[in-house]
Amino acid sequence: MDLISVLPSASKSCVCLHKPLSSSTHKLKPFCRKIRILGMPRPRKSVLMVSSMSISVNTLVSDDAVQRRTGGYHSNLWNDDVIQFLSTPYGELAYRERAERLIDEVRNIFSSMSLEDGESSDLIQRLWMVDNVERLGIDRHFKNEIKSALDYVYSYWSQKGIGCGTKSIITDLNSTALGFRILRLHGYPVSAEVFKHFRNQIGQFVSCHSETEEDIRSIVNLYRASLIAFPGEKVMEEAEIFSEKYLKETLQKIPDCSLSREIGDVLEHGWHTNLPRFEARNYMDVFGQDTKNMESNRKAEKLLELAKLEFNIFQSIQKTELESLLRWWNDSGSPQITFTRHRHVEYYTLASCIAFEPQHSGFRLGFAKACHIITVLDDMYDLFGTVEELKLFTAAIKRWDPSATDCLPQYMKGIYMMVYNTVNEMSAEAQKAQRRDTLNYARQAWEVYLDSYMQEAKWIATGYLPTFEEYLENGKVSSGHRVSALQPMLTMDIPFPPHILKEVDFPSNLNDLACAILRLRGDTRCYQEDRARGEETSCISCYMKDNPGATEEDALNHLNVMISGVIKELNWELLKPDSSVPISSKKINFDITRAFHYGYKYRDGYSVSSVETKSLVMRTLLEPVPL
């Protein structure tokens, strides 16, 4: 593969414009025409200002007066030495054998619960087990046991909820809220109307006067349940408002303990920005500090030991995968692309936090590679490339042939081959998993994606500000969500026949909503930095254009309301009962949305990856859990 030079060739070049794969209805014959490429010898001066909290804007001026913008992004935080010198003993056989014994012991705990049927707490005990194996990240070992436990709980579910046990005379909020959340997440048809029975005579949720740990925990579970609301569930909105306020006030009153840590984590990360492996790492600390659990409950000890072992064993797998990713990154010539962000380790970490089953190596590596390519293309189309060069590149991608590089500036040749080779390689991996060729399908997705970039590049070049609707429709494609998810998803051991794929990928509501969240949330976090780089077009600026007199604050408030509504719609698309598509088939696309949403929680965590994103890498990838 050609190494990449960021400096375009000064020679003339041509472009061969062929019929794109995605435009099958066009009858135009292929033709070639020569287009003059503005050369760019090595720039005289480059000024780089790096800040961990801000983005600087640089302009490179070539000898022939071509100006190219760069983002002034901070450099790669994870050099070769950091990756190559990672070491962990947890890949040894003894640790895996210990984990297997613990898995059997936990299965026995699940089995023993059937002997306690009819006991005063048989329902809450089952929910406790399911909730904790999921939060600790070890639920993949107990799918059958979880289903059996939830079938049992659901058989006693009523319009007023449930109590602690099957013989409970009255229902209670803690059991009902925890049960509602878990049952809904597993596709059981439970109605939010059940929470109306826990409001006072004037229809308001009321706090408990005693405020015991059990009372507080009930509100924690009510808050967790409220986050998986469907559109139109007014009672869930009220529950969220009440429980969030209650828990924030409670944090000011109670001492620092495992419960306060749990409340803080739940309020901080919720569900839509909480990544399963990251949640597991945080919950291990909470779970292990809960003296009530650890002193009187042998079950808790087994769960915690297994969770820690599994976490550390997976880090030995991550080390091997990171070495593979690093080889790809170097072989692709990526280190020589100096105008872009290098966040391949961060993207791999996100993938590892949502799909940490050992067999999903193809997904983790594919996601990291796809996201790196997307980042390079994003920076090339938004900042570095001229409009004429970008037209050449877009046309070359639609040819899908290495000879298309003959028509490209020198700095684009290696980028083209990185896209070409990686997409082909991921298609080969997908063919093994899905037993059919998906290359043409993937090519169509990449073509549409680059067309959306081309549209934005034209807007930037001409200073055109589109309407909000026009911008959002294009922006959902240019967000990159679809191309980041599609091929990595197809490498998994989850069947995606065509009728399922169309309900998960384009043109499904699930895909549309996921792309919308990424575009809307991304713009609320990036618009100021983008504007400083000369990119005026964003959801904020387009909304203000459509609504004369509206301020940035008005626009942000409107977008946040939109995001809240889209999240509820996304919940419905994932969890709606009686769907023809299993939740397991939709979950990975949904979790990718959570991963991107996490990256934009506080800032643009991909441009500025030296704060929260760096902490995520350290906590889930580099640092083992003390046993």
Swiss-Prot record:
Pathway it works in: Terpene metabolism; oleoresin biosynthesis; Secondary metabolite biosynthesis; terpenoid biosynthesis
A Pfam family recorded for this sequence: Terpene_synth
SUPFAM superfamilies: Terpenoid cyclases/Protein prenyltransferases, Terpenoid synthases
Domain text: The Asp-Asp-Xaa-Xaa-Asp/Glu (DDXXD/E) motif is important for the catalytic activity, presumably through binding to Mg(2+).
Cofactor binding description: Binds 3 Mg(2+) or Mn(2+) ions per subunit.
UniProt-recorded name of the protein: (-)-beta-pinene synthase 2, chloroplastic
Binding site for Mg(2+) 2: 378, 382
EC number of this enzyme: 4.2.3.120, 4.2.3.119
GO CC terms of this entry: chloroplast
Short motif DDXXD motif, span: 378-382
Gene name linked to the record: TPS-(-)Bpin2
Subcellular location field: Plastid, Chloroplast
BP terms from Gene Ontology: alpha-pinene metabolic process; diterpenoid biosynthetic process; green leaf volatile biosynthetic process; terpenoid biosynthetic process
Role: Monoterpene synthase (TPS) involved in the biosynthesis of monoterpene natural products included in conifer oleoresin secretions and volatile emissions; these compounds contribute to biotic and abiotic stress defense against herbivores and pathogens. Catalyzes the conversion of (2E)-geranyl diphosphate (GPP) to (-)-beta-pinene and, to a lower extent, to (-)-alpha-pinene.
Top-level class of the enzyme under EC nomenclature: lyase
Catalytic activity: (2E)-geranyl diphosphate = (1S,5S)-beta-pinene + diphosphate; (2E)-geranyl diphosphate = (1S,5S)-alpha-pinene + diphosphate
Chain segment of the transit peptide: 1-51
Binding-site list for Mg(2+) 1: 378, 382
Keyword Plastid part of the UniProt annotation: yes
Cofactor: Mg(2+); Mn(2+)
Gene Ontology molecular function: any one: pinene synthase activity
Naturally occurring in which organism (per UniProt): Pinus banksiana (Jack pine)
